[in-house]
Amino acid sequence: MTKYFTSESVSAGHPDKIADQIADAILDAVLAQDPNARAAIEVTTSTGDVSIFGELSTSAYVNVRQIATETIREIGYNHAELGFTADSVNVSNKIVEQSGDIAQAVDNADDDPEQLGAGDQGMVFGYATNETDSYLPLTLALSHRLMRKIRDVREAGIVGYLRPDAKAEVSVELDDQDHITRIAAVVLSTQHDENVSLEQLRKDVRELVIDQVLPQELVDDKTIYYINPSGRFVLGGPQADSGLTGRKIIVDTYGGAAHHGGGAFSGKDATKVDRSAAYFARYVAKNLVAAGVADKLELQIAYAIGVAQPVSLNIDTFGTAKIDEAKIRDITAELFDFRPLAIINQLNLRRPIYKQTAAFGHFGRTDIDLPWEALDRVDEIKARL
């Protein structure tokens, strides 16, 4: 039976990603002054408007409006015809202080007063696969690369009529062993100026973006290309669709290849296990796969609010384990400390490093240096096999 798998990505100019980048830009600015700040910032975008709200406890002062407008300008919304520009947008700031009840639960863990308790209950997942050098599913890796490439040709003026909003989707065909045999379909929709023909756009995007990214050994004469299949895409970004932080959590993580605990990343400081523990779970999963314990691996960690130690830890190798899964779990529990403060210290997460993750994925990044992508525990794992 023929099987298929698909992942998608969106550009930095997508309305939801604008919101994520503003939230993380504010977080970075706060952390640059106050590494111990607590933040849970949410952002909405719509035509001519950005609303910023959530909770923040910090000694830092940051100019929220300036950060928002600078972020919008960097993304490329700087022309009046886009209907949403850095110079004209209305920014409202409704941030309030974090609840004292939450703060006391985090500051003194119920099971260890010297540790930070988890900032909330919930579960997170980490995943890695040896399908690609980035340890991400190929479909997601290619979708992200398509979005970075179309940004690059737009910003370099190579295709000057492109606008910031875009989406990509890659589908692959799998054999009975779930190995990729070919790329079945590519979908790419991009915002554009009014005066370009659909024929010209499709030609340029195919030649200058798609053909530069796809591995040609996986492309054949049956590969289907859908480039702006809806036709006209002049109105885009927040002028056409509202945006909200945390609405692209599958794009941010594993493209649908793994489970997701439901918690978003952007705008949250590292005491929020939604973010920090998800990063650490990726770090652990990636090092385990790189050590050869399995071809792909998913790690689940669950927490209780105000408690440092995880409630549970589970590993699934999808039938690809090279050793017994129980041994993989024992090695994981022995080598890695999953308490929130330990995670923060191991990955040095009280730094302004988050805005760069808010577009093109939080994992598998080869264009930036992220601590949870380091393969620095492989030898320790191998020594215990």
From Swiss-Prot:
Residues that bind Mg(2+): 16
Associated pathway: Amino-acid biosynthesis; S-adenosyl-L-methionine biosynthesis; S-adenosyl-L-methionine from L-methionine: step 1/1
Keyword Flavoprotein: no
Keyword annotations from UniProtKB, A to Z: ATP-binding, Cytoplasm, Magnesium, Metal-binding, Nucleotide-binding, One-carbon metabolism, Potassium, Transferase
Cofactor: Mg(2+); K(+)
Biological processes per GO annotation: one-carbon metabolic process; S-adenosylmethionine biosynthetic process
Highest taxon listed in the record's lineage: Bacteria
Subcellular localization, as worded in the UniProt entry: Cytoplasm
UniProt remark on cofactor binding: Binds 2 divalent ions per subunit.
Molecular function per GO: ATP binding; magnesium ion binding; methionine adenosyltransferase activity
UniProt-annotated stretches for the region Flexible loop: 98-108
GO cellular component terms given for this protein: cytoplasm
Family of this protein: Belongs to the AdoMet synthase family.
Protein's job: Catalyzes the formation of S-adenosylmethionine (AdoMet) from methionine and ATP. The overall synthetic reaction is composed of two sequential steps, AdoMet formation and the subsequent tripolyphosphate hydrolysis which occurs prior to release of AdoMet from the enzyme.
Subunit structure: Homotetramer; dimer of dimers.
PANTHER family: S-ADENOSYLMETHIONINE SYNTHETASE (PTHR11964)
Entry protein name: S-adenosylmethionine synthase
Gene that this sequence comes from: metK
